[in-house]
Amino acid sequence: MATPNCLILWVLLIADTVWTQSVRQAYEIQDPEDWDVHDDFYCPRECFCPPSFPTALYCENRGLTEIPPIPSRIWYLYLENNLIESIPEKPFENATQLRWINLNKNKITNYGIEKGALSQLKKLLFLFLEDNELEEVPSPLPRSLEQLQLARNKVSRIPQGTFSNLENLTLLDLQHNKLLDNAFQRDTFKGLKNLMQLNMAKNALRNMPPRLPANTMQLFLDNNSIEGIPENYFNVIPKVAFLRLNHNKLSDAGLPSRGFDVSSILDLQLSYNQLTNFPRINANLQHLHLDHNKIKNVNMSVICPTTLRAEQDAFIHGPQLSYLRLDGNEIKPPIPIDLVACFKLLQAFII
């Protein structure tokens, strides 16, 4: 005799089979020209609607120049790698369930985005607009948005108030754009109360961006022209754990004496800069990249972030550094034995 769990599984399998068959029959019997966007099984003829995944609409790699009408059942919309130049309101007027839109690799401009086209999507969580022709961060955007991907555009402007209502945004990717220091005001990031990852690598910044969101945990600023870090800069982002500043123009003169002595930072990347001395670090730091600078000496009085405790608790309370890169500098052997004595948890040391 079948158990209750087996019966439930059997019923679910039957229901799924019936749904899939009904979808397939709808596609086979109906002429696409007769379909209406309000129909349960409507599928734009330019796209593919998999019967086994009825909430997804695949329209990628089809040479489309316009966005087709989006059925109301769709949660996931794939429109990448087309020739689309605009985002009007009308195709989305019934798409009230959309959670995910991928419009990467198109030709979308700010002028082509109708004002209410995106903000009307009240349930949208993920918006991908990478590799387009945007010159500023689009606005207005839906309050529900959690991730905004704008890499590899031409963004040089962030209009005032763009992020003021995006309190649910956790990830903002602006890498490989044309941002200068004048793109930021003191309140540019106001409203991003839950932002955790901010990527502005490969821009043209010379200074650290001001007033970052307090919950920022991952900050990526590689491949800019940043020359220094203001005193107490990290006080406003007390949760920052991953900091990447590779390929900048940081020098000793541009760093406060305790610029990186920040207890929250676990991974610090300063490769390919112009540092001549080992920066002061915090005992909590786990990964440190200092390769390809101009460091000549290893001064243990600066490097070792705390006075070593008794041998029995050094592993618990001492420096937590486990990975250190110093290759590509001007350091001459021998390396001080105190280096190993200080960093007892060191597992990888590249020099």
From Swiss-Prot:
Disulfide bonds join 43-49, 47-59, 304-342. Its main location: secreted. It comes from the Eukaryota. GO terms for biological process: cornea development in camera-type eye. It is found in: Secreted, Extracellular space, Extracellular matrix. Binds keratan sulfate chains. GO terms for cellular component: extracellular region. Residues 1-20 form the signal peptide. Residues 34-72 form the LRRNT domain. Selectively expressed in cornea of adult where it is detected in keratocytes but not in scleral cells. In embryo, first detected in periocular mesenchymal cells migrating toward developing cornea on 13.5 dpc; expression gradually restricted to corneal stromal cells on 14.5 to 18.5 dpc. Detected in scleral cells of 15.5 dpc but not in 18.5 dpc embryos. LRR repeats lie at residues 73-94, 97-118, 123-143, 144-165, 168-181, 194-214, 215-236, 239-259, 264-283, 284-305. InterPro entries: Leu-rich_rpt, Leu-rich_rpt_typical-subtyp, LRR_dom_sf, LRRNT, SLRP. Glycans are attached at residues 94, 168, 223, 299. Keywords: Disulfide bond, Extracellular matrix, Glycoprotein, Leucine-rich repeat, Proteoglycan, Repeat, Secreted, Signal. Belongs to the small leucine-rich proteoglycan (SLRP) family. SLRP class II subfamily. May be important in developing and maintaining corneal transparency and for the structure of the stromal matrix. This is Keratocan. The gene is Kera.
